[in-house]
């Protein structure tokens, strides 16, 4: 292990030495640091002796970890007291990128935090998790008064591991209005757990390269250094990284200075960065790597795209570089606020838990969300890159410049970014019509969850969200997709210009500070008043009904009488809503509408029921509500109007806007699941698809028919269903075969490319021989010349899956080898997912075992791979057995804070529709109470509710559905 020293530049002290070599030297020189700081600033810390303490044990009685369970003790509460307010940190870290004598990767560091005492107190609580401290005078930290006076002495310190605090008890109180500095020296593990300061790896040739990187959100900055780790505790950060000289260090801000040191024959660089603006701990980031970058310095903001050298050399960063500048410019205009920092670094990491993270000025991504290679990446990969970039850059203002006060309002942060990502992406790719996709990707996806009694409001009470697992659980589809959908609705009824006006004043007023969601409502109300926007009530009164109660309404209209009413839409109409609502689950609903002859003015439904004469159109024409699905609600009609809409779809479907053709399908299927219309009416909405070539209606139908597949692919119903889908998709397959000159040309429009993929994937997966023969032929061509893949990137997922499904071990092994050597992560993702398409039980069982072996499947991909296996009818019971037998291992790896953990529970239970499976799920819950379910707790309750709903739905609809499919295919 390398040894030596570095020069630390802490506040008010220059030239204090912190050893970086052998443990004894580290301890001795750490004491020198503490002693010198005491001399300079009146330190408190006991006698000048040192020892080392770990996160679980200590060496002296003064630092023994507390075992007190009294909930009234401040250190047993999850939230910080408000007595202390941090103002600045100086953090120095040195990651060691080779294992130590214990075969562990570690980092060492010191941290100095200056804080203001706002209320006199004799207790300091600061977050710390899995850090080992070098004791100073027998204590974990030393305390100094900034003005040179003598601070109170420390009487006791310990690590409260449950609530993740370093606790310091003082012999006297800190004085109100006085500034203090807390200094600590620590060591942590540079683990591969994807949290805090962690280790990522990749291979270059046969050499393993190690990257030291970060993921602080939500509660993991405390795993990198002791800090007041709550979003409202904003401060200025000065970061210094000590790193091998052949590596580069980057952080939120530009490099301020760098110099080189020789320590025991190894060359180290000490890189200090400019101080950050006031910001939250969860947005801090630093990376030490041998990555390369491409850059654009033509504007006032330096833009760099970083990644593995091979990926950058192959041009995989060029698309992100091309689009980042225009997206930043778009948001500067949209927010009427200049980008707040001098640079924008974006880094593609080989190992990353989330999709991306909006660290201020240093955004981190999974490689598949930043890197793009035209030779390997599909149009879906390209859309993913531009939308994720737009999402993260949107946060640079909304979330970073102005930040939520606490995680109970996460929806405003993530929902807003999930909405405006479509606006930013549209500005970068204006020919794609990408804003329309929000209806399918966000609104309809989240409604499936929000129609459960186990859903939750967008905004929680602040006291409902406390523990790290509770915080992680808030990062769900409700926060992201419902938040986006509700804000889209708000922007629509205000108009985008008025919405932007309120947004801009909100950002200007709260820059570098924290807010609650009502602050945005106040600024939007000012814009409404200024522009005289007619509304039935205040912004707060309207929007509170959408944010403070879960769910959404179904609006039912009778076109014979003009009556319109609303009710809480639940997939299981017999379920009981236990969460109370002061609004009694009613909403103020903005309704847009049209008939064949005109488009009407927006109508507001403010009561449970009303009558609107404009809606009384009779039985000989149709009425359509919720144009472009701008409102977050479903629509039901009297049978006569449904018949008219179905007739219009049959005669000339293009008379109805394309988004609303998708709406008719999605509403009908979900109303049928809720027993508000017949299941045959829902199925009838798919008849016109034999003449439809647009993507959105087809995707809406496939999404809903997938539920039928999940419910019936283990029964005789699936045979008749397969014949029907073959009948409907064959014209689409033929249409795209002709349009693409036998699959050799790529359609120009984004939506057309997506629907070509639908045509291939549906035809192959439902057994159309011509499609499967195409897949086999393309696979064989590739097999004969591995270096020349003849399959177009857009079609690879479908073709690979079909080849694996219809092949055996030989095909699986070939695809596995290609996965291991894939040069682009988007290609590796396609191959990894295709491997789950096997119909061989033993192969899928082996693949499940691979998911818990990080040498075969990266940790970041483990849960999504299990999910894909579970989506396979052969793999589903295997995945369920695997989850149950490996729950402790999986929970230990992913349960506490993984964004994907809740999806794991949902995926493996999505087919459950029998009493036996319900009992298994209930037993699973009972058997694992001691371990817990962490961030999957709510997902488990939702799985139980879905299963009960599925049981009832299948009982009531199986025979009717079977008869309908048989009748539709009787002549085929």
From Swiss-Prot:
Keywords: Aminopeptidase, Cell membrane, Disulfide bond, Glycoprotein, Hydrolase, Membrane, Metal-binding, Metalloprotease, Protease, Signal-anchor, Transmembrane, Transmembrane helix, Zinc. Residues 2-10 are cytoplasmic. GO terms for biological process: peptide catabolic process; proteolysis. Residues 73-967 are annotated as: Metalloprotease. This is Aminopeptidase Ey. It is a single-pass type II membrane protein. Pfam families: ERAP1_C (PF11838), Peptidase_M1 (PF01433), Peptidase_M1_N (PF17900). Belongs to the peptidase M1 family. Residues 32-972 are extracellular. The gene is ANPEP. GO terms for molecular function: metalloaminopeptidase activity; peptide binding; zinc ion binding. Homodimer. The lineage of its organism: Eukaryota, Metazoa, Chordata, Craniata, Vertebrata. It is an enzyme of class 3 (hydrolase). Residues 33-72 are annotated as: Cytosolic Ser/Thr-rich junction. It comes from Gallus gallus. Binds 1 zinc ion per subunit. Detected in the plasma and granule fractions of egg yolk (at protein level). It comes from the Eukaryota. Zn(2+) binds at residues 391, 395, 414. The record marks 480 as: Transition state stabilizer. It catalyses: Differs from other aminopeptidases in broad specificity for amino acids in the P1 position and the ability to hydrolyze peptides of four or five residues that contain Pro in the P1' position.
